[in-house]
């Protein structure tokens, strides 16, 4: 058996299948493209899902890939096992070969056997296989054609050897190949539960059926093949180690964990588990952030946040108290950079995001520790020796407090907590998250799928021209149905063979315009691409009737498109300027490009200063003034990245990509752009704000929209200059001076109101003499709670030992504000907070506070007398 490094195995696998006529497809992003039903790519076949479903055509029938895969949820939830077993991972690489209606079982089995035994030189006697119990064909191929003895072929049921994409759709039997690790792992029966001897290394899925809504299986006209072999597993076999964590993929990261912790791997099982968790999670963190996932409180970002916090928790178990994961990112990149060169480009960004999240969690953990001890103290006061599930879940969910650390602290304090209630709340939260995620899923109308399979791909000519003189109407959609004709006033969708209309994608909105024929005029209100390769024009028939098969003139709204192009190229310049001013950690996190304005979301950890915004705006405008040519080139994806072109995180790119070079910007982009930077005209930032933690948003305008905004601000300044009788360069000083004058006048007015209120109090104050103290109450007009407090303090000093209520009607809001002040000597028996609650509740109000001072309010001015009566009752 040949020893091979992981890089050598990856290269060998792809080279072998390339020699067998397979197109090598680079790994897709971990973030699934156009599939909101999945949080992450969790299998090697996911990027080919639409091909298997017949929704997408590729220029090849055979493919092979090494796909980045991430599993933490659904049926593929490996998180809790990570670090505790030799094989479970969150992130791993899946080697796979695929056939889309080309070869089938015989060839798939032949390829797998030949590659394993001849190219990897695994001894044949070490290999066993399983087949679906009813799949006689696969059994015969293994037995008769390959020559595998019957004793090494195990028939298994639906659970183990029948694969399906979902409740309905493509499915079929599978055949799994196992490696016998030898008698030192026991002598269990092949296929038994908890079998550590026989290691599954390759799964061959034979997609030959379509399951309908009733569960009935129908043979597919073009059966397909989907196979998957985990790189980490096959590496453990070829490198002769018992655990994936002992392969060259993980050893450098575990060595890093040893160095940063001062512990030695292999000496203590608890420490070993922690190091394995850190090694796995560091790989996941690096690839997730590189592919565009950012820490957040929901969705993919929440998963990343959990992974980072889980790794930190295990680091704490090793005695690591400071941020350290960001340093380990370098180790992961060094190991994986050959296969994934984009990691090098994203290194600084990945480290910045990781370190920031580590620092936040360490601060949060300190705060949540304080809250936990407060909960323990409160429980002791209530004679409880346990915390509720609700209390502990809040710490876990809101603050990310590790549950095992919580258990340890509670145990040390002699406490327990309601674990059942905690898990119930956890499941409820997971279910809410699942429903929230699924609700984002957009169903593709069956009519679009029908057209996708029926029609040739639309030809888009909108890069070169805004008008197509001789397009043909291929289809008309009304509602969810295909129709032959549509008449005046009807809302429909039209599909053309050739179109200049750009469909909404990549943040750029869809084009508008008209489609006209000899007998009709159709207004295009939006252009969309519901499935790849199908462009639909949505709008209304203005007059006449349109028929399928008609030849038409399609004309895009020229002014609108030009404004969109200005904003799109301006967005590229803005992105480059932000990186120039703020640093390379800036990455696009979302965008909207319209004819009216642009919106650009980007990664940054604090609000931008006025100086930074000014520098960005000035840099963009300098690039516009240079009036350089905007160059569009088509090149191979890898070549584009090497040339320095920026790739946007969540975009999917073909092997051949468009690279847009505009001044300081060079990006991969499929959108429409101006010919020269000077065509943008002028650029102006409107606002900068927060979207979420670590993500900022800039809204801006370009071209005539920017000129309009500039003119609007110019005339506002002129009007202000006239109104304030100051020159434009003196406006700021004039406004500051006016503000100070207004504040001074407000202070004078406030003092006069207080004096007036105090003079009225002497006439209206009601005093009840009690034994050893006084009870007083009074009503004053239109004072706020702070002013009421000052009056109450004044009366308390004047009257000596006393309990005082001061109330004020707010006529405008139809509300009564009131305060109660109690001398400290009386606050043990007459607590201000209790008095406020009692009198407020009697008048349907609310309030509370300290024993010596409290405040409240009621939303009905007619109940003021009732408030006073309740107050007097307390002392009667």
UniProtKB/Swiss-Prot annotation:
InterPro entries, sorted: aa-tRNA-synth_II, aa-tRNA-synth_II/BPL/LPL, Ala-tRNA-lgiase_IIc, Ala-tRNA-ligase_IIc_anticod-bd, Ala-tRNA-synth_IIc_core, Ala-tRNA-synth_IIc_N, Ala-tRNA_ligase, Ala_tRNA_ligase_euk/bac
Record GO biological process: alanyl-tRNA aminoacylation
Nucleotide-binding keyword on record: yes
Keywords attached to this entry: Aminoacyl-tRNA synthetase, ATP-binding, Cytoplasm, Ligase, Metal-binding, Nucleotide-binding, Protein biosynthesis, RNA-binding, tRNA-binding, Zinc
Primary location: cytoplasm
Pfam families named among the record's database cross-references: DHHA1, tRNA-synt_2c, tRNA_SAD
Any Gene Ontology CC annotation: cytosol
Subcellular location: Cytoplasm
Keyword Aminoacyl-tRNA synthetase: yes
UniProt cofactor note: Binds 1 zinc ion per subunit.
EC number: 6.1.1.7
Coiled-coil regions listed: none
Residues that bind Zn(2+): 568, 572, 669, 673
Family matches, as PANTHER family: ALANINE--TRNA LIGASE, CYTOPLASMIC, ALANYL-TRNA SYNTHETASE
Function: Catalyzes the attachment of alanine to tRNA(Ala) in a two-step reaction: alanine is first activated by ATP to form Ala-AMP and then transferred to the acceptor end of tRNA(Ala). Also edits incorrectly charged Ser-tRNA(Ala) and Gly-tRNA(Ala) via its editing domain.
Domain notes: Consists of three domains; the N-terminal catalytic domain, the editing domain and the C-terminal C-Ala domain. The editing domain removes incorrectly charged amino acids, while the C-Ala domain, along with tRNA(Ala), serves as a bridge to cooperatively bring together the editing and aminoacylation centers thus stimulating deacylation of misacylated tRNAs.
Family: Belongs to the class-II aminoacyl-tRNA synthetase family.
Name of the protein in its database record: Alanine--tRNA ligase
Gene from which the chain derives: alaS
């Amino acid at each position: 058996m040949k020893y091979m490094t992981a890089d050598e195995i990856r290269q060998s696998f792809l080279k072998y299948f390339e020699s067998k006529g397979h197109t090598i497809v680079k790994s897709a992003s971990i973030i699934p493209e156009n599939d909101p039903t999945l949080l992450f790519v969790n299998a090697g076949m996911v990027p080919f899902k639409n091909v298997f479903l017949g929704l997408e055509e590729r220029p090849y029938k055979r493919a092979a890939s090494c796909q980045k895969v991430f599993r933490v949820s659904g049926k593929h939830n490996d998180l809790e096992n990570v670090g505790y077993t030799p094989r479970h991972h969150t992130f791993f690489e899946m080697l796979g070969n695929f056939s889309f209606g080309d070869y089938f079982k015989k060839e798939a089995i032949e390829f797998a056997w030949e590659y394993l035994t001849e190219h990897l030189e695994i001894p044949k006697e070490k290999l066993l296989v399983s087949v679906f119990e009813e799949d006689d064909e696969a059994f015969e191929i293994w037995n008769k054609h390959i020559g595998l003895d019957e004793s090494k072929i195990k028939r298994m049921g639906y659970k183990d050897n029948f694969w399906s994409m979902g409740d309905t759709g493509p499915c079929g039997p599978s055949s799994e190949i196992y490696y016998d690790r030898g008698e030192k792992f026991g002598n269990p029966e092949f296929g038994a539960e908890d079998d550590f001897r026989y290691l599954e290394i390759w799964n061959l899925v034979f997609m030959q059926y379509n399951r309908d809504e009733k569960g009935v299986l129908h043979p597919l006209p073009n059966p397909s093949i989907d196979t998957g072999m985990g790189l980490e597993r096959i590496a453990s076999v070829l490198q002769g180690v018992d655990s994936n964590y002992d392969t060259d993929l993980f050893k450098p990261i575990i060595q890093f964990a040893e160095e940063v912790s001062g512990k030695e791997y292999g000496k203590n099982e608890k420490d070993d588990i922690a190091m394995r968790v850190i090694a796995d999670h560091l790989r996941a963190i690096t690839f997730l952030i590189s592919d565009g996932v950012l820490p957040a409180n929901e969705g993919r970002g929440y998963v990343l946040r959990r992974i980072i916090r889980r790794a930190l928790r295990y680091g704490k178990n090793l005695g690591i108290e400071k941020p350290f994961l960001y340093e380990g990112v370098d180790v992961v990149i060094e190991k994986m950079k050959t296969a994934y060169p984009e990691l090098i480009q994203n290194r600084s960004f990945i480290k910045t995001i990781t370190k920031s999240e580590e620092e936040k969690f360490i601060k949060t953990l300190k705060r949540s520790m304080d809250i936990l001890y407060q909960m323990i103290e409160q429980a002791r006061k209530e004679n409880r020796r346990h915390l509720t599930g609700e209390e502990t879940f809040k710490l876990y969910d809101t603050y990310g407090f590790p549950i095992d650390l919580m258990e340890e602290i509670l145990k040390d304090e002699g406490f327990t907590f309601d674990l059942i209630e905690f898990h119930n709340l956890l499941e409820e939260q997971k279910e809410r998250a699942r429903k929230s995620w699924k609700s984002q899923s957009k169903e593709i109308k069956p009519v679009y799928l029908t057209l996708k399979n029926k029609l040739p791909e639309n030809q888009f000519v909108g890069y070169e021209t805004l008008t197509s003189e001789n397009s043909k109407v291929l289809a008309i959609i009304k509602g969810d149905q295909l129709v032959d004709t549509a008449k005046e006033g009807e809302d429909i969708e039209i599909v053309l063979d050739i179109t200049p209309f750009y469909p909404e994608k990549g943040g750029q909105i869809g084009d508008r315009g008209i489609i006209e024929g000899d007998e009709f005029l159709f207004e295009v209100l939006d252009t969309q691409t519901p499935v790849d390769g199908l462009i639909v024009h949505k709008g209304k028939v203005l007059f006449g009737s349109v028929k399928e098969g008609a030849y038409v003139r399609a004309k895009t709204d020229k002014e609108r498109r030009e404004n969109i192009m200005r904003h799109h190229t301006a967005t590229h310049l803005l992105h480059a300027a932000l990186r120039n001013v703020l640093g390379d950690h800036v990455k696009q996190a979302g965008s909207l490009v319209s004819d009216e304005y642009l919106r650009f979301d980007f990664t940054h950890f604090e609000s931008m200063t006025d100086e930074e915004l000014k520098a960005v705006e000035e840099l963009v405008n300098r690039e516009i003034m240079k009036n350089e040519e905007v160059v569009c080139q088509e090149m191979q994806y890898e070549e584009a990245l090497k040339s320095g072109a920026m790739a946007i995180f969540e975009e999917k790119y073909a092997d051949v990509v468009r690279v847009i070079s505009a001044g300081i910007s060079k990006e991969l982009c499929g959108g429409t752009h101006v010919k020269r930077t000077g065509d943008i005209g002028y650029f102006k930032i409107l606002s900068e704000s927060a979207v979420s933690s670590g993500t900022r948003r800039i809204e801006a305008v370009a071209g005539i929209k920017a000129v309009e905004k500039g003119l609007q601000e110019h005339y506002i300044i002129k009007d202000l200059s006239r109104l304030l009788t100051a020159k434009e360069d003196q406006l700021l000083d004039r406004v500051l001076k006016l503000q100070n004058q207004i504040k001074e006048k407000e202070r004078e007015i406030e003092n006069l109101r207080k004096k007036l209120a105090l003079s009225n109090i002497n006439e209206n104050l009601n005093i009840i003499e009690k034994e050893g103290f006084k009870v007083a109450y009074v009503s004053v007009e239109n004072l706020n709670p702070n002013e009421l407090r000052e009056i109450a303090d004044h009366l308390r000093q004047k009257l000596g030992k006393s309990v005082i209520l001061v109330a004020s009607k707010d006529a405008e809001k139809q509300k009564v504000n009131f305060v109660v002040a109690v001398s400290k000597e009386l606050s043990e028996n007459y607590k201000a907070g209790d008095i406020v609650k009692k009198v407020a509740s009697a008048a349907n109000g609310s309030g509370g506070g300290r024993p010596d001072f409290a405040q409240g309010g009621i939303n009905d001015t007619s109940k003021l007398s009732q408030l006073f009566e309740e107050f007097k009752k307390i002392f009667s």
